[in-house]
Amino acid sequence: MRVPDCGCRAIPFITTTLLVACGGGGGYSAPYMPPPAAMPTVTFTAPGQSTTVNFGRAVKLTWTSTNATSCTASTSSNTGGTFTGSEPASGSVTVAPTAPGNITYTLACMGTGGSASATTSVTVADSILSMLSVAGMTTIGSTIDPVSADYNPYGLTLAPATAGLITQGDLVVCNFNAGMQTQQGTGTTVIGLHPTAGAMPYRIAQSADLQGCNALTLLPDDSISAAAYTANENPLVTAAGVVGTPFSTDVFAHPWGEAYVAANGTNPAALYVSNVDGSIDRITLDGDTQSAFTQIASGFCTSGTPGAIFAPSGLTYDASIDTLYIVDTSSNSVIAFTSVSGIGSGGIVVNGQCSSVSGPPTPAPTFSGSSATSARVIATGGGLFTPLSAALLSDGDLIVANADINIGSQTPNQVFEISPVLPGGFVGQPVQLDSGAPGALFGIAATVDSQGNQIVYFNDDNANAVMKITVAPQ
């Protein structure tokens, strides 16, 4: 195409090479005209693109870009978590929104060809505990043993199967005190309740090996592993109610917490047991028998006597992230042991600073040992007052109950929602479940029913009953 020796011409925007050759008496000149730089593109997503999470949970943001040299992040709200400033051209980040609401995350990327941006939106719904506070409460039934009148319910868990005396979904409770006695730690019974309002308690087992039972967990065959403080045993009760002591008895130091962990990959099934000497043990299982014993942690601060014991308790396991949570009553803290299945003998030394004050509360601990990096404090103080029990909610948060030992003027019988990903751990406000005498809350359990409702059960020591709260899915 011939063109004038000077001038301009508009052409369509295309990616091509332009060549202009000019001739004269001395020959031709043909300068190279490079194509324009390509515009950046950005792909930016959160799980489900437009997603909803409960307050207290984290969101993973992921992005890729092309033709970009730099990117800048921003959020529509200062409650969106830490997603601001410079980011690489491709990457991902996990953010924990700090309040309910609608949040838009924006990523703007720039390159030599221009700029482009993309957004993703997240709805942060109310926390589960905040919905519990307005939900109705139902009395399931009395926890008093129908034969001996043992009372003062401590341990509480749910049956995973139907076997022997137990039906799947039944509530299994152990009583800390013997009938007609006020002395703490004398109870010797485990009872069951069908999970319907007005249920009557039925006896599962009675034995001196269960004396002072304060926590329990069920194996897949409904065998009951019980922490028997006074007996200094960890008996195993069959679903038919037969009590045995298959585990080494010389290794316990007054068991005070229990959690069962199913086999996962190369990790065999195990029981985790906390003791009143401040240690955490792992009993590796072969069926219902012990194949190995490992003390994975020691050093939690302990003190007190039955009825006012400060020791690690409330053991709760999250199988999705192989994490064991421990309620540290002495320091008013909740501790996480991550990758707990891989923690070896003496792997965590808890530096509890037990002698730094005259008595509880003690400072939140630090950690040393070969697996020290697996241990961290996820919440401390903030209204926790001698916390004792915990359960895992459907979204991965914990519900934690105070034991109210020497509570003074503080509000008694409160539960807290604790997030392992939210800075500081505390989600929303605590909820008071019983307005009566302090120290009503002991065992607590959580599940999800067939309709997707979050169910929370708790032992109310003031009423010697199991209570139920239901929260419908959002």
List where the protein language model places each region.
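Bacterial Sec-dependent N-terminal signal peptides
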Residues: 11-43, 126-127
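Solvent-exposed segments in extracellular or luminal domains encompassing
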Residues: 85-104
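Beta-rich, blade/repeat-based domains predominating
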Residues: 145-168, 206-224, 229, 249-271, ...
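Short loop/turn segments immediately following the C-termini of beta-strands
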Residues: 176-178, 228-230, 275-277, 285, ...
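Short loop/turn segments immediately following beta-strands, especially the blade-tip
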Residues: 193-197, 239, 283-290, 337-363, ...
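Loop/turn-rich, solvent-exposed surfaces of beta-rich toroidal or solenoidal domains
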Residues: 377-433
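Blade-level signature of beta-propeller repeat domains, shared across WD40, Kelch, NHL, RCC1
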Residues: 441-474
